[in-house]
């Protein structure tokens, strides 16, 4: 089968012909109909986050149909529409038993430590599949598995209450989902912070209040818009320490900042003025949980989460096209999500 693979860090991905995956007794072979291209894959290609062993087929946002099932995989049948939960876990350790499988002691990840979705087929454990409703296109089902689910988990971690205000720093693939989901969680006002006017216009379409960080100090603008109070929840989705600091500085008394973006650099804050003095919190978040996916999919099925505008491009299973999409993400272009349609 065809697969676009990372063969060496800091080098373009390569199209290769590789053997079809072999499924185990509890596995399912999925025929990939759509695979999202995530900013995390930019980090993998650049060598900022380890991927091993190489070569590796990237891609952790996957939707498709069941092609074949293992002997003991009885939940799904051939041609069922499915999405793939990319966090591989043992199901028996302390973290799995407490519903925090992203910290599984034997944990792994599809598209990083196991071959992923930049291919025609992928083999996954049956327990990592969720049914994809007929109302949701494969392209949207794919990006629900990372960009939307990560946003959903971050909002849950924020403990957002009805009537509170939220600022989303970065309205790309994750942020445009976070804007919509925040209203589903009961937010009164959602402020969308970005430097890209196109992304801000899209966020405004979903009832966000735009804050252009290119032309204004976003912290001062949020303070002004909230009559000096600040926001109850700020979610940082870029991965720049400067933006993380702005998220913390924009908080109201007893506000919570959730850090989603990945950075290799430290975050420096005024500990008393920005944290202790107003009993603010900084919350880290990591991936998402399998138990969160059914509600997320139902919100999408009901039209509470609209993703058609979030998919700015589709590309074939072609190395040049995929590398170009990764380049665009690396350069923070206007693209929100590019999806591979094999």
Residue ranges of predicted features:
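C-terminal hydrophobic helical "lid"/dimerization subdomain
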Residues: 245-249, 290-342
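Glycine-rich cofactor phosphate-binding loops and adjacent beta1-alpha1 units
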Residues: 158, 201, 206-281
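Mid-domain Rossmann-like dinucleotide-binding core that forms the NAD(H)/NADP(H) cofactor-binding site
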Residues: 134-216, 220
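NAD(P)H dinucleotide-binding glycine-rich loop of Rossmann-like/cofactor-binding domains
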Residues: 90-169
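Residues in the short beta-alpha loop(s) of Rossmann-like NAD(P)-binding domains
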Residues: 196, 263, 288
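Glycine-rich beta-strand-centered segment in the early N-terminal region that forms part
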Residues: 21-35, 48-94, 133-136
